[in-house]
Amino acid sequence: MQDKAMLMIPGPTPVPESVLLSLGKHPIGHRSGEFSQIMAAMTAGIKWLHQTQNEVLILAASGTGAMEAGIINFLSAGDRVVVGCNGKFGDRWGEVCDAYGLTTERISAPWGQPLNPDDFKAVLDGHRQKPSKAVIVTHSETSTGVINDLEAINRHVKAHGQALIIVDAVTSLGAVSVPIDEWGLDVVGSGSQKGYMIPPGLAFVSVSPKAWEAYKTATLPKFYLDLGKYRKDAAKHTTPFTPPVNLFFALKTALEMMQAEGLEAIFQRHQRLMQATRAAMKALNLPLYAADSCASPAITAVAPQGVEAENIRSLMKKRFDIALAGGQDHLKGQIFRIGHLGFVGDRDILAAVSALEAVLAELGYTNFTPGAGVAAASRVLSTA
């Protein structure tokens, strides 16, 4: 049944019914006073979610658009940048830097493992003669289910003194605390189809005063993604280009839901769902791709043995209409990924684990005790 479909992927994530109803409203003029009022309310709500007093700009784009904007607005061709690469999205930001003619130095870790903060210190210390202009880090690496130690990496960047820190928080913002002001994060990009609980189409970029100073001398080409245009219009509660008006309706409703739950409760819920999911996979003897010490609260990657990952995904969809994410690039067919991001609760985890047990049995996987996964998840959920 199509109306019973479950999205257990890291994006797009499930959308609450109240948000869907907001999407169904008649559009309004994006140059109207009514839209300006919505923009003003969104500005305050977005700052609350970002834990910042910095400007947070809203673009009609994806998370990749947010990150490209976050890179090109503050740098010039030939600038030295350091990019952390331990998955598909860290690699992507390196590709963006290469495309714009930046001098890109990559700090790498194997997929499934976190970046080593000390590697950033060593590289930045070696750049004293020609300092790096920016360090680009993916907080939650969606492709592998790894969360990087952003706080520790940021400490090394701050000790360096000059470099901006540019953060991909696409699957961390709204799932784990990203205290932008407390940590002094300069540029933070995210997308609406993740922790925001609304469909794809909006991107968000938080910009610090230090980054705006860099903007004044940055010369990389930009037009639609020129954040200066968005800043100027945001001050008047409008946008430089036509926005997806109904997504702003949805964002307003979603932010009201999040504020009613509270930031700490949101973070605790994601932590609890992650722990329940990982406990279930261990009980089913399904190897986890990332260690507990670096597990992302947004997504769990599983590397099954004795049963094909793609067969699991296919049968989960066919039998139960539950969508799981697959592996990307060289991990395609090697892992499957369970999203527990955004509008996901205890019932969703228990339903997904129960369905997974049935699928494993149907595929002939016998290395588990029936009911063990559900029991393990239930224990976590009942005590957390």
UniProtKB/Swiss-Prot annotation:
- Look up the record and give one Gene Ontology term from the biological process aspect: glycine biosynthetic process, by transamination of glyoxylate
Give the record's keywords alphabetically: Cytoplasm, Oxidoreductase, Pyridoxal phosphate
A Pfam family annotated for this chain is: Aminotran_5
Single GO cellular component term: cytoplasm
Q: Which EC number(s) does the record attach to this protein?
A: 1.12.-.-
Family matches, as InterPro entries: Aminotrans_V_dom, Aminotrans_V_PyrdxlP_BS, PyrdxlP-dep_Trfase, PyrdxlP-dep_Trfase_major, PyrdxlP-dep_Trfase_small, SP_NH2Trfase/AEP_transaminase
Q: Which family does it belong to?
A: Belongs to the class-V pyridoxal-phosphate-dependent aminotransferase family.
Q: What does this protein do?
A: Soluble hydrogenase catalyzes both production and consumption of hydrogen from suitable artificial electron donors or acceptors. This subunit catalyzes the tritium-exchange activity.
The protein, known as: Soluble hydrogenase, small subunit
Biological source species: Synechococcus sp. (strain PCC 6716)
